[in-house]
Amino acid sequence: MNDAFDLRLAPAAVHGIVARLRELGFRSWLVGGGVRDALRGVPPADWDVATDARPDDLLRAFPKAAPTGLKHGTVTVVDDGKHYEVTTLRGESAYSDGRHPDAVRFVDDITADLARRDFTVNALAVDPSTGAVIDPFGGKCDLQARVLRAVGAPRERFAEDGLRVLRAARFVATLEFELDPATAAAIAPTLDTFRKVSPERVRDEWLKTMKARSPSRAFEVMRATGMLAVTCPEILEGVGMAQNRWHAFDVWRHGMACMDRCAGDPVLRVAALLHDVGKPRTREFSAKTKDWTFYDHDKVGAAMAEPICERLRFSTDERRRIVDLVRHHLFHYDGWTDAAVRRWIRRVGRDRIEDLWTLNEADVRGKAAAVDEADMSPLRRMKEHVARVLAAGDALSVRDLAVDGSDLMRELGLPPGKGIGVLLGELLERVTEEPARNEPAALLAIARQIVAARGMD
């Protein structure tokens, strides 16, 4: 790793910010994840600037900047749709609430500012005039060794801000680093501070973690250090719980493998994490098969996933998606008729099908370190069958029927009410079995038969 930083890596907007501050007589440094990522050869997602200019000076220097964190000395400069945080140098302060400093103390020394940061690899700065890397805590060595180490005394850092322990777990996954033993050992003693972190922040860290190639690295840290016992103890019920002969892993390790193999967005990966959460509460030994069974673990798991998602403040849409996928992650393939496939589509919802394909493939591949490709054949056949049924364009909801409630009331003389919806549901069932019946005359004839048989009026 070179001693000098290649300043050409920083975008023109960052150089413009630095030039404006220099023009007004202020010093500035490139800091944060942008420096860290550039030094390890990864294109930075964002760039931050630290400066000895005070907040009022920043507003004068950048009158169009958003005062996103002015209390803490931060403004956000927007250039060509991209956001750049510019922050006044700050020193250390007490953290009584376990999340925020009691008072903000602005300083002029970049080393003092870096000393308050969480990990050595994030406590690096670059002088934009020379490209010199300022590294008072050995962050460059830790980057080379791929080690995540707290700045200074780990227990002090974690006692200041409870979110830092969760960030440690995330960085282990997203950076693919190993956690320094002393840093890891400091997590459990500071869990009382971690308990002060809001559920929303925990959720956000989970979703950021899910962008890693192997998010299981983070969740293993959370398990080993006690964080998961605080945020989601239900998942821990699967640790060490053996499964049936088709699984090489216990419930916990299978969940980790499924999550890693689930090549979807972060919310889908949360569903993968929780898909078998109901197994420990449904496990029974079968005298007939001489093996473990987990009957209804999908339903039990969905009932467990709902309060977990509520507790972590997932949005309504995210919660519904996760719970639906846990509830419907089990399905069968061969031997299904077209009618059975249509019922399955109605049950799971057309908008969940692609998610279920991704989740099911990850579920199968997560049964062992290596899975025979023949094990994927049932899923491929199911996908082909569903594609054929969808291509046929047959009715899959009441809206697809050739008659509606108004037609039934007009042609059969029925009053409005819940009975109309029930009758439409009956017609959909008939059409599910025989799609050719989905035409007005046939449906009205069937409706008359149902009304006559049940005495509806």
Task: Please give the residue ranges for each predicted region.
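Catalytic cores of the polymerase beta-like nucleotidyltransferase superfamily
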Residues: M1-D457
